[in-house]
């Protein structure tokens, strides 16, 4: 352990008195849980907001036959940057789960408190819902025009609640006639398992190939790679993103926006798949005898990171 002195932000600069007082209140154990939940909510908000914004351009561009509004490449990058921003901005306050799969993995493999996990998951779903509402508001004029166009073309019933319809900006659906539910399940399960392994690799403090500063990019690019390769056959990867956005779609278009049996796959299958990915990493890649010096961290910080 390094003998370098521990320097706090308050040692380097003074904050306004109102912020200093608020910090004391915020860091109190009775209040801090709300700060953690806000961080989880806002982290999910960030990547869903950027991801749905690019998805809106893609869907609307296809409906109005306007090319170059967006692309699968752009959507993948939007989600990747959103995840990167979320980790960089919010993880120091909450630990940076931003995904019910990750939270449940911490419960199972790290002893994360169950009540705290429930709070996190609710906050994560809320973040996706708020992001969806904001994207809908910002794209509302074009969404309404596209909806009216589908009605006039008598294509509303066949297109609206598909990946090619305005509701598909928010809720995830299968491409009609192009993907079966079993294949969608396979697609979701395999990719969620891989994502789980990659996240756990980034969190492994002894994994010298992925130092802490590279972790956010490592995880973000994993999501981008899956979107680039498997978004078209349908992939969700995140219960909060799927359920929060789907609930919003149902708030606008009613129960039809809930989708078919695929909705349960998109919402739930990533959970056991991620747990399997973490289990595989723990079995085949984690090594308790593998050491690594952590000179910039003290015991209190380590406890916060791994709890």
UniProtKB/Swiss-Prot annotation:
Aquaporins contain two tandem repeats each containing three membrane-spanning domains and a pore-forming loop with the signature motif Asn-Pro-Ala (NPA). Lacbi1:387054 has NPC/NTA motifs which is in accordance with the fungal aquaporins (NPx and NxA). It is a multi-pass membrane protein. It is found in: Membrane. Residues 62-68, 142-157, 204-216, 286-307 are extracellular. Residues 1-40, 90-120, 179-183, 238-264 are cytoplasmic. Water channel required to facilitate the transport of water across membranes. In addition to water, also shows strong ammonium transport activity. Also enables low but statistically significant glycerol and urea permeability. May be involved in fungal nitrogen (ammonium) support of the plant host in symbiosis. It holds the Pfam family MIP. GO terms for molecular function: glycerol channel activity; water channel activity. Belongs to the MIP/aquaporin (TC 1.A.8) family. It catalyses: H2O(in) = H2O(out); NH4(+)(in) = NH4(+)(out); urea(in) = urea(out); glycerol(in) = glycerol(out). Induction: Expression is reduced fourfold during ectomycorrhiza formation. Expression is highest at 15 degrees Celsius and decreases at any other temperature. It comes from Laccaria bicolor (strain S238N-H82 / ATCC MYA-4686) (Bicoloured deceiver). A motif (NPA 1) lies at residues 99-101. This is Aquaporin Lacbi1:387054. The chain crosses the membrane at residues 41-61, 69-89, 121-141, 158-178, 184-203, 217-237, 265-285. A motif (NPA 2) lies at residues 167-169.
């Amino acid at each position: 352990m390094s003998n370098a002195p521990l320097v706090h932000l308050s040692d380097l600069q003074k904050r306004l008195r109102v912020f200093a007082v608020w910090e004391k209140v915020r860091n109190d154990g009775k209040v801090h849980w709300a700060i953690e939940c806000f961080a989880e909510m806002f982290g999910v908000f960030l990547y869903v907001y950027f991801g749905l914004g690019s998805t809106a351009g893609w869907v609307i561009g296809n409906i109005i036959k306007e090319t170059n509004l967006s692309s699968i490449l752009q959507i993948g990058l939007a989600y990747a940057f959103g995840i990167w921003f979320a980790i960089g901005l919010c993880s120091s306050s909450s630990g940076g789960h931003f995904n019910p799969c990750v939270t449940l993995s911490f419960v199972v493999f790290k002893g994360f408190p169950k009540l705290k996990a429930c709070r996190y998951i609710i906050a994560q779903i809320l973040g996706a819902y708020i992001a969806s509402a904001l994207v809908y508001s910002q794209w509302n004029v074009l969404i309404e025009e596209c909806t009216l166009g589908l009605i006039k073309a008598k294509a509303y019933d066949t297109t609206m609640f598909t990946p090619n319809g305005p509701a598909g900006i928010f809720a995830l659906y299968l491409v009609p006639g192009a993907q079966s539910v079993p294949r969608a399940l396979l697609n979701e399960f395999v990719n969620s398992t891989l994502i789980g392994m990659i996240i756990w690799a980034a969190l492994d403090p002894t994994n010298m190939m992925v130092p802490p500063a590279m972790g956010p990019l490592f995880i973000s690019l994993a999501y981008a790679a899956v979107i680039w390769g498997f978004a078209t056959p349908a992939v969700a990867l995140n219960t909060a993103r799927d359920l929060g956005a789907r609930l919003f779609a149902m708030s606008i278009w009613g129960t039809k926006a809930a989708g078919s049996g695929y909705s349960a796959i998109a919402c739930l299958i990533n959970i056991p798949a991620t747990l399997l990915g973490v289990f595989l990493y723990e079995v085949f890649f984690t090594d308790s005898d593998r050491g690594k010096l952590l000179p910039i961290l003290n015991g209190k910080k380590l406890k916060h990171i791994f709890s």
